[in-house]
Every structure is written in C-alpha cells, then in structure tokens.
Amino acid sequence: MYIVNEEDKEYRFGDSGPKYLMKGPRMNFALVQFQAGQDFKAHYHNVMEENFYILEGEVDIVVDGVVNHLRPGQMIHIEPGEIHYVINNSGAPMKMISTL
C-alpha cells in the first residue's frame, strides 16, 4: 500500500501529456492534460485495455477511425489492438484520467 501526491509528479511534456501517479506491472494510473490544439500520436496496446475518464474540458478520441467527442463525466473504454489518437480540438485545456 502507498499514497501518492499529485504535486510530486510531473507531466511528460512539461504542461501536457500523461502524469503517471502509479505505474505497476498490472496497471498504470495517470492524470492526462492537453492544452488547446495539442494531440498524442495514434497508437495501440497489444495486451492492455485503456480507459479515459474526462474531468475538465472537451477532447476528441479517435478509435479505429471513429471520432468520439467526449465531455466531463464521460468515459471511453479502448480494447487491446484498437488504434487510438487523442486531440484537444477545443480552445481550452482539458484534463482526464487514464487507466491502463
């Protein structure tokens, strides 16, 4: 058991990208932030499922070519092998939780 303070962690790309609060052998938990217009390249996972839960702002998550526009309170589940791409097409920052 352990406790993590978000303030002790940093976003991968300065003010954006994933901020991993926990990386383990069976699961990762991250706070993800994108500024307006920022994106994360298309990719997939061979074994892991990924979930995104939107906390603030709006984001487009493209899964196998289908655009899913998500708002706070919505979650998307991505299966292994599904190619996904994340882009903040809004004019404001967005924040979401990622479990992987």
Task: Please place each PLM-identified region on the residue numbering.
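Glycine- and acidic-residue-biased ligand/ion/polar-headgroup-sensing regions
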Residues: 47-49, 53-59, 64
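Short strand-connecting beta-turns/loops that link adjacent beta-strands
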Residues: 26-27, 47, 91-92
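Short acidic-glycine-tyrosine-enriched beta hairpin
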Residues: 65-80
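Ligand-binding loop in jelly-roll beta-barrel domains
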Residues: 80-100
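Well-ordered beta-strand scaffold positions
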Residues: 25-27, 58, 66
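A short, N-terminal "cap"/entry segment at the start of jelly-roll beta-barrel domains
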Residues: 1-28, 41
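Conserved short histidine dyad/triad with adjacent acidic residue
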Residues: 30-45
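Histidine-centered metal-chelating micro-motifs
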Residues: 39-41, 60, 76, 80-86
